[in-house]
Amino acid sequence: MRLIVTKNYEEMSKVAAKEMAEDIKRNPEIVLGLATGGTPVGMYKELIRMYNEGELDFSKVTSINLDEYVGLSGDHDQSYRYFMNTNLFNHINIDKNNTFVPNGLAENVEEECMAYDARIQDMGGIDLQLLGLGANGHIGFNEPGEALSVGTHLTDLKESTIEANARFFDSIDDVPRKAITMGLGGIMKAKKIMVIASGEGKAEVVKAMMSGKITTEIPATMLQMHRDVILIVDEDAAKLLK
């Protein structure tokens, strides 16, 4: 696992964007696994800047998102489809038909999950998977205690995750209780994984991910078993590392 410690969130975002940009330049038809949440927003802004300045071309890129809330349409302003459109896709030349997010309104969730995994397989897998870290160690919506081998599946969100996401909704009661998420098994199949984390609130999980015991109680520790992981964190998130 490669570790890069940056001064602050802004620098972390720039370093992460540069890492992804280099992979896109090397392979214009790259399949990117993308993440949502507060952490990647700065990185996405930097990718948009690079695109606007003619440094990047997304026209042949395919993207696969990790997860989506169950019960929210893609037009809902808290859905992850809406997040991706607003924070990245609407501002670059990616073909929207090549951007995939689980369907939170799928009538048959099990079929949606199986179809999502089949789509990833048909594309030849994910070349570069971007991950944020939940404070409880979740990646995607793979919450503590779940089995590693699971493919894309329906999951119940932990209370800590619901509370962490409540800031994006009018009330905690509006936060969906279920989500569709790529499984840890699917994430681990990515050829390369890039993890980004910022702030003191992520310091414990960053330490566990780097050197803690591998356990499903902290899903991020599973990444120790992947052959090509780069962890990009700011000084606050790295403060417990020796």
Curated annotation (Swiss-Prot):
It catalyses: alpha-D-glucosamine 6-phosphate + H2O = beta-D-fructose 6-phosphate + NH4(+). Its EC number is 3.5.99.6. It comes from the Bacteria. Gene3D superfamilies: 3.40.50.1360. One of its GO terms (biological process) is N-acetylneuraminate catabolic process. Keywords: Carbohydrate metabolism, Hydrolase. GO terms for molecular function: glucosamine-6-phosphate deaminase activity; identical protein binding. Transmembrane segments: none annotated. It is an enzyme of class 3 (hydrolase). InterPro entries: Glc/Gal-6P_isomerase, Glucosamine6P_isomerase, Glucosamine6P_isomerase_CS, NagB/RpiA_transferase-like. Pathway: Amino-sugar metabolism; N-acetylneuraminate degradation; D-fructose 6-phosphate from N-acetylneuraminate: step 5/5. GO terms for cellular component: cytoplasm. The keyword Cytoplasm does not apply. The active site is at D67, N136, H138, E143. Catalyzes the reversible isomerization-deamination of glucosamine 6-phosphate (GlcN6P) to form fructose 6-phosphate (Fru6P) and ammonium ion. Belongs to the glucosamine/galactosamine-6-phosphate isomerase family. NagB subfamily. This is Glucosamine-6-phosphate deaminase. The gene is nagB.
